[in-house]
Swiss-Prot record:
Disulfide bonds: none annotated. Belongs to the DEAD box helicase family. DDX56/DBP9 subfamily. A motif (DEAD box) lies at residues 180-183. Residues 243-475 form the Helicase C-terminal domain. It comes from Botryotinia fuckeliana (strain B05.10). The lineage of its organism: Eukaryota, Fungi, Dikarya, Ascomycota, Pezizomycotina. Keywords: ATP-binding, Helicase, Hydrolase, Nucleotide-binding, Nucleus, Ribosome biogenesis, RNA-binding, rRNA processing. It is found in: Nucleus, Nucleolus. ATP-binding RNA helicase involved in the biogenesis of 60S ribosomal subunits and is required for the normal formation of 25S and 5.8S rRNAs. This is ATP-dependent RNA helicase dbp9. Residues 332-380, 573-607 are annotated as: Disordered. Its main location: nucleus.
Length: 607
């Protein structure tokens, strides 16, 4: 990235650049010593850009509206100063009251924030109490949790509004209010809840709005909660080679499954991967398809219990699982980033047009009812996986189904290349001439793939990013096509519905009945896996093994490490035992016939 030079040919630092002063440390920010111990335990070396800017302003009591990219440490940026102020207040007064309210759009993000509070307060847990109101417990249990006036309450706007109206949650002593992922909160339909919280909340409360984008929704929240806030537009400069490498593949509808099979079977992607699909049924169809080849994966969707979803994310971050198939049901409409070029007004107009087009396309899709009404399980409105959740060390984001807007695309690929790491985003696009050519694998949203791709390319170009074509050697890929066809035919609609029912039933049992057991025996939680085979599809054992003649040289090295060795045509070890058993049985049968007087008796005439 080129930088402007002053009169002396010295580079001028850009606004919000990543040039943080070398002497800025967590200790120099004036945080409590117990918090510094908790930070050190998390192996945080130095504050990120958003942390170094936001923490001092929050400690000064300023309202803040901060925009920073995903994975930049926004959660710690607002939690640390809040925890510091709570500890300082407790030194002067022992009165227990709720002083901080943190609003988030999804249950998964609420659980993540709660665990972050626990990690930072490891050395002062007795002095700071936090409650997560998004857990699936009865109203009586929630009232009992709030009766002790916890210092920090983490909730969705709906839960906070409900408990505030019933006087279970007291906001009389509130000093800090945070809205995390502010641009997403209103899109989840929390408008009335936020207005209700704003009415109940006392005046003079310090407000922090954190977001990856600054949209019209954020401006609405700014007018509702903030008083002359300090606006931080932070753009961390990426080093050469860092960030997300973006690729796109144009293919037929059934070729999505073929390419996915080849990618994972030949290990073309190294590391952990998140696969985004358009709906819940696609989750199970793809999982059952991959199971045919022995590739295990986990599922995330809104019909699974919240405890199971949270546990899947935790185990994924611990490297227990390598592949997650997630349904992105709460896509956000419109484009997000502010223009950086000189033609700002023109670009803003283009963005506004794109946002309207995205909204129109989405409305058209929602108005078209499905021909067959299927009984579906109850969806969790507070589910969200493409925003806010901190998936660790994700090597690749695979857009199996392209999102319906460039903004949703940006949020999806933000799950990789977090905190200065590198990552890859690969998207499958269906050309218009290929749409509905393979009806069993077709999806309605693919109709607009080419239009959405054009918006994505344009949007990424404004940010200086390029979406490159990813070229597969289709001659070598075609060798796997007949195996893909066998597996895909086995995954019928009935098999998908059976798998969905079985999975939800299993996860409900794991989530509810065993919750108390795992609280008492945390060691047993290790054995609770979510990537087991569903097995309602027709089992074809031969598909799990790739014949040597199908493997290209590069693929052979990737899957076997270059050492194939000798593979015999017969099972030498097991057959020896089986042959011996068969021989013994044969001996027994032969002796039996000889000793049978009815079969061996020979009548001879007397001479």
């Amino acid at each position: 990235m080129k930088r402007k030079l002053d009169a002396n040919d010295v580079p001028v630092p850009t606004e919000g650049s990543d040039a943080i002063k070398e002497n800025v440390t967590f200790a120099s920010l004036g945080l409590d010593a117990r918090l510094l111990q908790g930070i050190a335990k998390q192996n945080f070396q130095s504050p990120t850009l958003v942390q170094s800017k936001a923490i001092p302003l929050t400690l000064e009591g300023r309202d803040i509206l901060a925009r920073a990219k995903t994975g930049s440490g926004k959660t710690a940026a607002y939690l640390l100063p809040i925890l510091h102020s709570i500890l300082k207040r407790k030194e002067l007064s022992s009165t227990q009251c709720t002083t901080a309210l943190i609003l988030v759009p999804t249950r998964e993000l609420a659980d993540q924030v709660y665990k972050t509070v626990e990690s930072f307060t490891a050395f002062c847990a007795k002095d700071v109490r936090a409650v997560n109101l998004t857990q699936r417990v009865s109203d009586a249990v929630q009232r009992s949790l709030l009766a002790d006036s916890p210092d920090i309450v983490i909730a969705t706007p709906a839960r906070a509004s409900l408990n505030a109206n019933t006087s279970a949650l007291s906001l009389a002593n509130l000093t800090h209010m945070v809205i995390d992922e502010a641009d997403l909160v209103l899109s989840y339909g929390y408008d009335e809840d936020l207005q209700n919280v704003a009415k109940i909340m006392p005046k003079g409360v310090q407000t922090v709005l954190m977001s990856a984008t600054l949209t019209s929704e954020v401006e609405t929240l700014k007018g509702l909660f903030c008083r002359n806030p300090e606006v931080l537009k932070l753009e961390e400069a990426e080093d050469e080679g860092e960030g997300v490498s973006q690729f796109v593949v144009k293919c037929a509808e059934d070729e999505k499954f073929l390419l996915t099979y080849v990618i994972f079977k030949l290990k073309l992607i190294k590391g952990k991967c998140i696969i985004f699909v358009g709906d819940i049924d696609r989750c199970y169809r793809l999982k059952l398809f991959l199971e045919q080849f022995g590739t295990r994966s986990c599922i995330l969707n809104s019909q699974l219990p919240v405890n199971s979803r949270i546990h899947v994310v935790e185990e994924f971050n611990k490297n227990v699982y390598d592949i997650i198939i997630a349904s992105d049901e709460h896509e956000v409409l419109g484009d997000e980033d502010e223009p950086k070029s000189g033609d700002a007004e023109e670009v803003e107009a283009d963005d506004a047009d794109e946002e309207k087009e995205d909204a129109k396309d989405a409305k058209k899709e929602t108005k078209q009812p499905s021909k067959k009404k299927q009984k579906t399980g109850k969806k969790d409105k507070e589910y969200g996986v493409s925003r806010g959740i901190d998936f660790k060390n994700v090597a690749c984001v695979l857009n199996f189904d392209l999102p319906t807007s460039s903004k949703s695309y940006t949020h999806r690929i933000g799950r990789t290349a977090r905190a200065g790491q590198t990552g890859m985003a690969l998207s499958f696009v269906i050309p218009s001439e290929q749409y509905r050519k393979h009806k069993p694998t077709s999806i309605e949203s693919a109709k607009n793939d080419e239009k959405v791709l054009a918006k994505i390319v344009k949007h990424q170009a404004k940010k200086g990013k390029e979406v490159k074509p990813y070229n597969f050697d289709m001659k070598q890929v075609d060798a796997f096509r007949y195996r893909m066809g066998d597996a895909l035919r086995a995954v019928t609609s009935i098999a998908v519905q059976e798998a969905k029912t079985r999975e939800i039933r299993q996860e409900l049992m794991k989530s509810d009945k065993l919750k108390r057991h795992f609280e008492e025996n945390p060691g047993d939680l290790y054995h609770l896996r979510h990537d087991g085979e569903l097995r309602p599809a027709r089992v074809q054992a031969h598909l799990k093994h790739v014949p040597d003649y199908l493997l290209p040289k590069e693929g052979k090295k990737g899957i076997t490490g270059g050492d194939v060795g000798f593979v015999g045509m017969h099972k030498t070890t097991e057959n020896r035992i089986r042959k011996a058993r068969a021989a013994n049985k044969a001996k027994g049968r032969g002796k039996g016939r000889k000793s049978d007087p009815l079969k061996t008796f020979k009548a001879k005439s007397k001479k």
